[in-house]
Amino acid sequence: MAAEFNNDWDDLLKDEFKKEYYLNLRKFLINEYKTQKIHPSMYDIFNALKFTPYKDVKVVILGQDPYHGPNQAHGFSFSVKPGVQTPPSLRNMFKELNSDLGCYIPNNGFLESWAKQGILLLNTVLTVREGQANSHKGKGWEIFTDRVIELLNKREEPIVFILWGRNAISKEALITNPIHKIIKSVHPSPLSATRGFFGSKPFSKTNDFLVSINKEPIDWQIPNI
């Protein structure tokens, strides 16, 4: 659980793994994985950072904690493994994508192709007990992921930060560098999507910003499997 990302995150985060909070978190997780059903698999915990190197990050989509149902979470915010039913919040994201950019609604919720294009799909807490939302809250992950956000904030190339819902918007305080673009609204969850997520056009706004800084826009279309 001291990760190797095999990219530039290794050097940027190596000191975090030596800190007391992380050593305590590691101890906690070793016991949790031994005694409880934990998601995602320990081999998938850091997928967001493994798939999207620091230098390649164009967009950050912040989530809260991983899906806590069987076979859903695989280390990316909002994404589920192939063959798993698309969860309600992601269904609403696809609906907004359809009305915003005309993307067809895919038959899966596997977002790996976004990660490969420079979208860091980062949850603020990276593990969870099965069936128990927020069960690993306050164990140290927030310190680690705040550090990731702080490092991204320091970057000299602009990044789009997409913050949906109160938990994600609370991280806006860490994004102090004026070169970055912040796009925020209520969460795409069915509980709040009709109060300002639908019609907010976050996907086209992201691409408009990327084009304005001479970056390749994101191909948001998730293909059918």
Swiss-Prot record:
Domain of life: Bacteria
Keywords, in A-Z order: Cytoplasm, DNA damage, DNA repair, Hydrolase
Active site, renumbered: D65
A Pfam family reported for this protein in Swiss-Prot or TrEMBL: UDG
Protein location: Cytoplasm
Main localisation: cytoplasm
Catalytic activity: Hydrolyzes single-stranded DNA or mismatched double-stranded DNA and polynucleotides, releasing free uracil
Enzyme class: hydrolase
EC number of the protein: 3.2.2.27
GO cellular component: cytoplasm
UniProt cross-references to NCBIfam families, sorted A to Z: PRK05254.1-1 (NF003588), PRK05254.1-2 (NF003589), PRK05254.1-4 (NF003591), PRK05254.1-5 (NF003592), ung (TIGR00628)
Entry's family note: Belongs to the uracil-DNA glycosylase (UDG) superfamily. UNG family.
Task performed by this protein: Excises uracil residues from the DNA which can arise as a result of misincorporation of dUMP residues by DNA polymerase or due to deamination of cytosine.
Protein's name in the database: Uracil-DNA glycosylase
Species this protein is from: Clostridium perfringens (strain 13 / Type A)
